[in-house]
């Protein structure tokens, strides 16, 4: 038409050449865009839909804010006229002087404005209207293939499908296009029903526009009649098994609107059209979110093209002849009959052979199922082979699928039980595998389990009619998963056992070296540590390929390498924990005190020291203290004899590495102390603050021992003055000479003198004096009691005294034992 843009020549050639005089609503002429043919009468899809959309409205501003409306109905019923009046488009309309087809194929136009009862701006709605070629036209005659495909295309791509129908057509089957709708519904369900399972809320609105409504029959009654017809059509559809549960309401919503006669009541007709427009511009009245395809307008053009290709290439869409219809009906009837008979027999077999029966023989059961299937198909062939071969074979294939679907349920139940049983037995056996033969034995178990499963599945597969490859694949995946899990468990056990062995050996080595640490102690400890690590690596390293490890579990190189890295990290972590366990603050203090006591209390020969004066005490105290403190630098920092610190191959304090190799997850408290952890040093065993604390305690305890020892020396000196010995010698000279002259006394003096010397040398003189004093006290007490008994002749008193003496004796004996124990401990 004259309004075509010359700048878009490739699109204009497909545009309508009709005069815009067909637009009956006053609107600025330059706003009306020519319609474009989407699909021509030769079933060719127009590639220039997107340029047309770009021309009519900016894509960037449209996005998902658009609506697609299609019209469907018999030829020459005023579909194009309705669209032009309602949406202000310029689709071709019929010349009433010549009753012939006007719209050929499918056309689409952009609605510049919707006609309403009030002046409302609807440009932002971006409504695109598709005018579909009318059905039941004389031009196509019995060739209704395009009509069905066009109707199906409109149904698949639109949000609202306007079904244009005269009031007089309601209640008719062919006249109301119910037969065509049935076929369209059935094919639509087949082609697009599976997507419904994933997108449950998407629907299409069937807007039934009842034309030439006189008003004698209320709209509600007409709506009820049409709804019942649609539901009957839906119930009679041949639905796929997986979609059989879906209802008409899952796919479609219905709404109704009546229009009065255009010629006899033109004013009322326009009012009805405008009222319909009111409903279109009100949000969420007719246009609802779940009607939209949720793709942008440029994506919709691609979606529409793909839909048409799928619809056009589907052979099931060809219009069946009457002969084919009869063949389909009879074959379906025969198929239903033989299937019912099959179902009764199958039900009995299923009840008698439930999964899990211990006496179940898969071979006999498989033969029984094959015979049942063969008998059912033979019964079908006997009755249905007389009809059209293509329909007979098609329905036979459908029957086979239906039988196989039923067999599949039974087959899957048994295969599932068989799979669970096989996996359970395999898991029990795989857990029991240990050692270097794990990989070989796991392969053998996998092969035996898989072979048994496949042989059993073949027996139940109706001579390989039922596919069991998926079940075999799932079983193999489960077995592989179990093997992989057990491989990791065994690999972890190997690493943990090796770490335990390393920890035990390293603990002994560290304890031995640190019992008397020297400058080379840490060299020896590190050498022993590396020896343990090397022993683990050498046992699992491949001879032909250095640096590659194999643990005999069938694990891949990455897993083996990960295990080696885990072992190394754990070994360094164990090294750190062992030295910190052995060299703690308390242990260091104990070790310092032991070294001090060894030097302070005993001489070079290991005999106890007896200090005679404070000079000797002070000298040896300094030497002992220096001897003890000499090990502090060696035990607080792990340094080699070249004064270098021991550095691990891994940062064992890194939280990510600890999580990776030790499985330690950092918590909030650990994250708060992250800065402190960054300052930690592997070689630092005792921190400076801990070191100062230990030295302070050590100083206090050694000073206390020094003071105690010095006090005993001073007491010894002050208690026995030297002049006493001179007085004793002068006053006891005669007695001394008498003893010397008497051999018996002299011998006793020598014996007692030697005994006293021995006690003195062994530092047992004081305990001996305590024992003698106790003995003398006991003798005196007993003598007093005997004297009292002799002088006082009182039997009760004597008995009471005897009891007291006995109790006293027991108490004193216990006290003596305690004193002796204390003295021995002091010694």
Curated annotation (Swiss-Prot):
One of its GO terms (biological process) is endoplasmic reticulum inheritance. Keywords: Coiled coil, Endoplasmic reticulum, GTP-binding, Hydrolase, Membrane, Nucleotide-binding, Transmembrane, Transmembrane helix. Residues 1-26 are annotated as: Disordered. Residues 389-409, 472-492, 803-823 form a coiled coil. It comes from the Eukaryota. Its main location: endoplasmic reticulum. Residues 741-743 are lumenal. One of its GO terms (molecular function) is GTP binding. This is Protein SEY1. It comes from Scheffersomyces stipitis (strain ATCC 58785 / CBS 6054 / NBRC 10063 / NRRL Y-11545) (Yeast).
